[in-house]
Amino acid sequence: MNAPVKPSQLIKGATGDWEVVIGLEIHAQVSSNAKLFSGAATEFGGDPNSHVSLVDAAMPGMLPVINEECVKQAIRSGLGLNAQINLRSVFDRKNYFYPDLPQGYQISQYKSPIVGEGEVVVDLPDGDSTTVGIERLHLEQDAGKLLHDQDPTSTFVDLNRSGVALMEIVSKPDLRSSEQAKAYVSKLRTILRYLGTCDGDMEKGSLRADVNVSVRKPGEPYGTRCEIKNVNSIRFIGQAIEYEARRQIGVLEDGGAIVQETRLFDAGKGETRSMRSKEEAHDYRYFPDPDLLPLEFSQAYVDELKAGLPELPDQKKARFIGSFGLSPDDAGVLVSERESADFYEAVLAALADAARDGKLAANWVINELFGRLNKDGQSIEVSPVSAAQLAAIVDLIGEGTISGKIAKELFEIVWTEGGDPRVLVEARGMKQVTDLSAIEKVVDEIIAGNPDKVAQAIAKPAMLGWFVGQVMKSSGGKANPQAVNDLLKRKLGL
């Protein structure tokens, strides 16, 4: 589904150009208070084995019971990915042995997933966009966690995570660079967070990726792929792809062959290393779970969930552009995180004239607020300047009470001291001078005192800026800049 590969996306090798082919399997933890098949809590960070039911521990005779909220969250996610919702799906047993898997199998979905094909439009850093196909989304259980640092001779098992609901979102092999892959994961994370179906916290493991990488000469069939397991940051996903593509190219150019295998990414060294040979589906001996009936629901059930979906990033971006004249870049920045979009929406709601000042408000949110938050290492949720305060500053600019320069001084005062911007402007004498006679007096003084500059300005109109600067300086930055410009042009005959 993706566009033709650009020359800049090709990797130079000793034998010419190579194309990297990438597919991603995203494991997103479902936002739910209980696990997929038990009532145990999903809270992060509890004492080991403090959130484990008899079902999670695979005690004999205990049967799984589906959590309907997890089903709803999977459907919502599928709808957000423009995907086909399957009204009938089946849970299967994926059989393998590992100490953190008490049953000896994982309950997953193989042939009949809850969500079928979809697509995501991804905006890229260079301004282009690409469409990434979604192959499927299915529900499955997470495994537990092995603890190797509790004892020098023993490994312990923590089953708190065992049975937590995951959505595995499988992309088609449509990605052609590490930058595309990172942008895709960012977009997918944003969509899930808008929907409220996954918190997207990669540090806590709520979102992690298995990265499938292969290389080929342009126009040739797909090469043998390797899977890099459990990469837990967007930056590491990019690094893993870059390293693995180079590694495979090196092997092939040296006359070797790529072995299909599972690899791990060593974040400390920035490289991948072999973990085990890659399993095929038949290795897991999938079969329908006899303890669970097929999952069936009506189209009306899906339609009801669809009607309750929030406005998603692409829709919000289009509205910001159409209603407030924002550039695609600025709108993209605002919708990239749900919290920043919510803050901007709150500013719009507080403005006296959002139609007039919506674009100005966006500039202030992106340049002044985000800039200061980044400088101070703070998140927008704890911003010292509230949406209402920022809206008041924008109102003061829009109505001509203060200039942009004074507004920046006011923003700094509100950031450090707090307070109502309108009260501060009155109390500190920060109002812009709009009295034309007062401004004209200053303009006349500047012109009279600089006859040589007047001659230069008449010959070179760009010199007008010097006069504007002098008038603003004399007025303490309070003169209305537009009035100053108009008066100077009239007085100098420009």
Swiss-Prot record:
It catalyses: L-glutamyl-tRNA(Gln) + L-glutamine + ATP + H2O = L-glutaminyl-tRNA(Gln) + L-glutamate + ADP + phosphate + H(+); L-aspartyl-tRNA(Asn) + L-glutamine + ATP + H2O = L-asparaginyl-tRNA(Asn) + L-glutamate + ADP + phosphate + 2 H(+). It is an enzyme of class 6 (ligase). It comes from Rhodopseudomonas palustris (strain HaA2). Allows the formation of correctly charged Asn-tRNA(Asn) or Gln-tRNA(Gln) through the transamidation of misacylated Asp-tRNA(Asn) or Glu-tRNA(Gln) in organisms which lack either or both of asparaginyl-tRNA or glutaminyl-tRNA synthetases. The reaction takes place in the presence of glutamine and ATP through an activated phospho-Asp-tRNA(Asn) or phospho-Glu-tRNA(Gln). Its EC number is 6.3.5.-. Heterotrimer of A, B and C subunits. GO terms for biological process: glutaminyl-tRNAGln biosynthesis via transamidation; translation. It holds the Pfam family GatB_N. One of its GO terms (molecular function) is glutaminyl-tRNA synthase (glutamine-hydrolyzing) activity. SMART domains: GatB_Yqey. The keyword ATP-binding applies. Gene3D superfamilies: 1.10.10.410, GatB domain, N-terminal subdomain. The keyword Transferase does not apply. Belongs to the GatB/GatE family. GatB subfamily. InterPro entries: Asn/Gln-tRNA_amidoTrfase_suB/E, Asn/Gln-tRNA_Trfase_suB/E_cat, Asn/Gln_amidotransferase, Asn/Gln_tRNA_amidoTrase-B-like, GatB, GatB_C_1, GatB_Yqey_C_2, Gln-tRNA_amidoTrfase_suB_CS. Keywords: ATP-binding, Ligase, Nucleotide-binding, Protein biosynthesis. This is Aspartyl/glutamyl-tRNA(Asn/Gln) amidotransferase subunit B. It comes from the Bacteria.
